[in-house]
C-alpha cells in the first residue's frame, strides 16, 4: 500500500461511485492535482455502490412512478422526472468520454441496454398511467415511449408479468427501450483503476477518518486510522469531499462547519428477493416498476428487474424496507445514537412527530412475514415459485433530516450537498436517485466549490469536452438532447429510439 501523503490538494472520503466520479472529473480538468482517497473497507465500491446493494437502474425517470405525482385535477406533474432524466444524460456523457479516450476499455463491463417499463393494474392505476404516458410521450425527453393495455403486447415485452394473471384484470404498461442496467460496483472499480494509473492519485483502503480539523493555514487536517494496525496519519488538504454514503453525516459533524448544524439522518434498510435460475432470468429483459401503495414513501416503489452482474443474468424484486440503526451496511448499530447532537435533537423529534406515515410503513414492513413478501412478488410475477428466490440484503440508505423554520425539522428523500462558506469542504447527504446522477452531482460540486475555475481560460474548455451539453438545458433544447443521446448511445452500446 502506498504511503499516505502529508499534503494533498484534494481528499475524497469514501471510495464509492460518488468519490470515484468526482475524482475522475477533477483529474480530467486538472491532471496536476494531487488527489487522496480514504476508504474504511478493503476495496472500493463495497457499500451502496456494490452491485447487489442497489437496484442498478440507470435512473432516467423513465419508469419510476414516484417521480410523476398525479395532481388533484387528474393531470400528471412530470417536472421532477424531467430533472432526473436529464441529470442521467450527464452521466452518459461522462462515461462516453471515458470510453472514447480508452480510460474505460469496454462499456459492457458495467453497462447493458435494458428496457424500462412501468406496469400497473386496477382501473384507477390504468387511468393514471394512460395520462402519464400522454404527457410524457409529448415531451422530446421521452421520445419513443410506448403504451399498451393489451395483455398480448405487454406479454411480448415482459412475459413473466402476464403469464398466470387473472383474465380480464385491467392492466397497462409503458416501455422505453433506451434504458440501462448499470453495475455501479464494476463502474466504481473501473474509475478508481484509471485514477490509479495517473500520477498524483492514491487510494488508501482500511483507513477510517477519525478527526477533521482546521489548521492555522486554513487547510483541513484529515486524520485517519488504519483499522488493522490502529496507526494514525494526518494529511493536510486544500479541499475535502465527504462522499461516504451513510457515513457522510459523521464526517460533516466532525468538520464542525456551521452549515451542518441541525442536520441528522434517518436510516432505512432494504431487502431484495433474488432469482439466479437461468431459465427464468432469460425470459425477463426489462426493469419493471410498479406503483407504491398510497401513502408509502418513495423508496417503497416495487420493481422486478433484470440484473447483469459479472456477466451473470439474474432477477431482482423489491425493495422491502425495514429499520436498522446502522448508517452503513458494514457500520455499527450505534451509528444512529452516535449521530445525535444537541443541535439536531429537535429536528429529529419533529420528524418523529410529523411523519407518522413513514413510521407506519416501516413498522408494517418489519412485521411482514416471508409469505407477505412473496405475495408482493406474485403481484408482479404470478407464477413465481418460492424455491427459485432467495433473500438478499441491500445497502443502507440514510435519508436527510434537516432543520426547518416552520416545522423545526423535515425529512427529505433526495440528496443534498452541504458546503462550507469558504468552499473548502462539501458533504453529500441523502440517498436518491443516487448513483445514476453521480456525474451531475460532480457538476454541482464544481459549481459550488470551484466556480472560480469554470472560466474559458481555466476548466471550461475541458469540461465541455467531457460534458458537451454543459450549460445547455436539455429539457428545453430538443435538438441538443436528441444529438447527445444518439452519440452517447453509439459509444456506450445502448439502444436509441
UniProtKB/Swiss-Prot annotation:
It comes from Rhodopseudomonas palustris (strain TIE-1). Pathway: Carbohydrate metabolism; tricarboxylic acid cycle; oxaloacetate from (S)-malate (quinone route): step 1/1. Its EC number is 1.1.5.4. This is Probable malate:quinone oxidoreductase. Keywords: FAD, Flavoprotein, Oxidoreductase, Tricarboxylic acid cycle. The keyword Oxidoreductase applies. The gene is mqo. The keyword Flavoprotein applies. Belongs to the MQO family. It catalyses: (S)-malate + a quinone = a quinol + oxaloacetate. One of its GO terms (biological process) is tricarboxylic acid cycle. GO terms for molecular function: 2-hydroxyglutarate dehydrogenase activity; L-malate dehydrogenase (quinone) activity. It comes from the Bacteria. Its cofactor is FAD. Coiled coil: none annotated.
